[in-house]
Amino acid sequence: MFKKINLKNKTALVTGAGKGLGKACAIALAEAGANVIIISRTLPDLTKVEKLIKKTKGSCLKFECDVTDLNKFKNILKKIKKLDILVNNAGNNRPEHFTQVKKENMEYLVELNMKAAFNVAQICSQKMVKLKNRKKVGGSIINMSSQLGRVGAPIRSVYNMTKFGLEGLTRGMALELAKYNIRVNSVCPTFVETPMVKAFFKNKKFKKQVLENIPLGRVAQENDVSTAVTFLAAESANSITGTSLMVDGGWTAK
């Protein structure tokens, strides 16, 4: 029998939670009963998300932090009593043709999408394994990857590199954290109707090319991704680890 997702008494941390997918995931986890910790660089955005979560009678703590600031993130984790779920979501993209990629853009994407993702996952894992009954209660880490962690795409070589790296990290982490009953998976969305994608879609030619590459013929919605994340966070996914949940409308099936 299918059980309704219940994350009561679980503490979930979501990075990049000020808008887009992070915001959607934070609200969905709170609606499922989790105590949610939201992190973003922009305090006004966090305050808006906090209000939305409290409207659902959910529990929420907010911290303004750039996840590339390792020491600041470590200090935040010291203030948290326990952690059961991590949604490692913070990331960005700066599309450029490979031959014209600016050094500063490449370094920025590697710093955020790879190094910060690694550091956040490591620091949170260290916190999670310290819980005495961790093996009994389990834990879940969800790395927000992309369909472009599985296939290439024009003008996205650096983004490809960072997301392929995150896919590899997900599998390595899954093997090493399994003994603590901490599951590690990634969610790989196609283009999702977020503020960032809406900006890209101002280019009508690009939007047409994207839709032609999605067999279902439509971009994903934020709710499609937050539902996948909530599923992986819950007991319903107890035997799922070291894999990727594709939310890509069939893009990578071709």
List each language-model region with its residue ranges.
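Active-site loop immediately N-terminal to the catalytic Tyr-X3-Lys motif
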Residues: 99, 151-157, 179-180, 217, ...
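Conserved glycine-rich cofactor-binding loop
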Residues: 11, 18-20
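Short, small/polar-rich loop/turn modules that mediate ligand/substrate recognition or access, typified
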Residues: 178, 183, 240-242
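Residue(s) in the substrate-gating loop at a strand-loop-helix junction
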Residues: 146
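Short C-terminal tail/terminal secondary-structure segment
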Residues: 2-3, 151, 230, 241-254
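Substrate-binding pocket helix/loop in short-chain dehydrogenase/reductase
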Residues: 97-98, 102-110, 210
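Active-site helix of classical SDR
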Residues: 121, 162, 170
